[in-house]
């Protein structure tokens, strides 16, 4: 049976939850959810590789002071191992489809992630968080493995200098310093962590 045949009417569901379909696909071992307009960066690659080396199932990235959701729809990933957690992931996807039934509004995907995935993710995750590590305090929080690219005056020469960026940039002027508790212990000097 084709995957799409298992979920008739999926095309009528809130479109932003379609991107979570790999949770219920037995052929997927690992996946990363991004917005189409969010270009990958070296910073993101370093964070993903850090997570891949861990034994944690979920990867959450909050790389902007406005990434205030427990799980930002454009910045997370999962390891799905058939023998360990595929049935659980499939049930989560189906619960998210049920959650969005008859609803359609901006942010609904993140509400569904918070209601369905967050209770499990916070037990088994790596979370790279540059500004809100104190808000989502967890033993699984980690500072970003690389410093945010910035010029000598802390301006941002690169437009896409945060994960999930669709063209914006983070500078000291528009975001301020990242909190000290979100910086690597060996790099308290990273003002734009």
Regions found by a protein language model. Give the residues of each.
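Conserved glycosyltransferase catalytic-site signature
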Residues: 16, 20, 45, 106-111
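Catalytic metal- and UDP-sugar-binding loop of GT-A-like glycosyltransferases, i.e.
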Residues: 34
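Active-site-proximal specificity loops/subdomain of glycosyltransferases
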Residues: 1-31, 39
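Alpha-helical recognition domains of nuclear gene-regulatory proteins
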Residues: 30, 50, 115-116
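Secondary-structure boundary elements
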Residues: 25-29, 53-57, 84
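Catalytic core and acceptor-binding pocket of nucleotide-sugar-dependent glycosyltransferases
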Residues: 57-193
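Intrinsic disorder
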Residues: 30, 42, 103-107
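Conserved donor-nucleotide/metal-binding helix-loop-beta segment in metal-dependent transferases, i.e.
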Residues: 11, 38-72
């Amino acid at each position: 049976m084709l995957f799409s045949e298992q979920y008739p009417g999926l095309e009528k569901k809130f479109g932003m939850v379609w991107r979570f379909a790999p949770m219920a696909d037995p052929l997927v071992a690992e996946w990363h959810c991004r917005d189409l307009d969010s270009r990958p960066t070296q910073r993101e690659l370093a964070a993903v590789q850090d997570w891949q080396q861990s034994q944690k199932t979920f990867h959450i990235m909050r790389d902007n002071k406005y990434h205030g959701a427990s799980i930002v729809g454009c910045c997370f990933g999962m390891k799905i191992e058939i023998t360990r957690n595929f049935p659980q992931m499939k049930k989560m996807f189906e619960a998210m489809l049920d959650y969005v039934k008859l609803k359609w509004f901006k942010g609904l995907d993140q509400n569904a992630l918070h209601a369905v995935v967050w209770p499990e993710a916070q037990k088994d995750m790596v979370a790279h968080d540059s500004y809100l590590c104190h808000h989502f305090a967890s033993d699984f929080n980690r500072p970003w493995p690389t410093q945010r690219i910035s010029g000598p005056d802390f301006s941002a020469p690169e437009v896409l200098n945060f994960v999930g960026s669709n063209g914006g940039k983070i500078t000291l002027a528009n975001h301020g310093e990242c909190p000290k508790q979100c910086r690597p212990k060996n790099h308290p000097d990273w003002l734009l962590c």
